[in-house]
């Protein structure tokens, strides 16, 4: 009986550990990574504040580190990001989508806003 309880308990703990990001959240995180990367590599003539480029790159790093923390494999994460980058490559700056992604990072990742601020400070 103890053996069965241990197995059930282990299964529950494993599932809770991976509950940090649903499939919808993962898709949104990948989309945001693609948008952020497109923001960083804007086509010539596109206006964009440098501080927003910093925040975009920091947000990409925070999203990836959080994904790895909660158990998403690096290969799975990178594959998803690459698809999103291909989708948004060369896109013009979209303030609404970018702000939506900032809101997502701040709400989906524990201390997301603070993590992004920390990474921005390390970019130099």
Where are these regions (language model features)?
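Sec-dependent N-terminal signal peptides
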Residues: 4-15
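Charged, amphipathic alpha-helical interaction segments
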Residues: 15, 37-38, 106
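Boundary at the C-terminal end of the N-terminal hydrophobic targeting segment
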Residues: 17-19
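Residues embedded in well-ordered secondary-structure elements
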Residues: 21-22, 90
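Short N-proximal segments of mature Sec-exported proteins
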Residues: 22-72
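Compact alpha-helical subdomains of small soluble proteins
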Residues: 50-124
């Amino acid at each position: 009986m103890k053996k069965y309880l241990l197995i059930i308990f282990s299964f529950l703990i494993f599932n809770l550990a991976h509950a940090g990001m649903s499939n919808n959240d993962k898709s949104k995180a990948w989309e945001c990574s693609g948008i952020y990367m497109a923001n960083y590599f804007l086509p010539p003539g596109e206006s964009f504040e440098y501080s927003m480029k910093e925040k975009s790159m920091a947000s990409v790093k925070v999203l990836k580190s959080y994904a790895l923390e909660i158990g998403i494999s690096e290969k799975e994460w990178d594959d998803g990001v690459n698809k999103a980058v291909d989708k948004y490559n060369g896109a013009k700056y979209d303030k609404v989508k970018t702000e939506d992604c900032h809101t997502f990072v701040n709400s989906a990742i524990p201390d997301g806003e603070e993590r992004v601020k920390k990474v921005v400070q390390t970019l130099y």
